[in-house]
Amino acid sequence: MEKFSLINKDRSRIKVFEPFEDVSKPSPSIDAMMISYGCIYKRSIKPVMKGSRVETIEAARKEYAELLKEGWKKTSIFNSYF
């Protein structure tokens, strides 16, 4: 799985979806996604991340689909910051 970012229509908010490894288990596996969210003040500077949470892969897929329906777009503009 890869890391990807979504940005809203106004280009003021960003969400970053990335695989979450549970290293507390003997054999680390990826069975969850970490969703980080933040604000964009200027396109030329790093977004200000407000927080993050860990969701199941199914819940993350559902949220991703809902955001796309709301008009969010996949972006790679800020990938160098994460």
Residue ranges and their predicted role:
Residues M1-E70, T75-F82:
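Terminus-proximal functional modules
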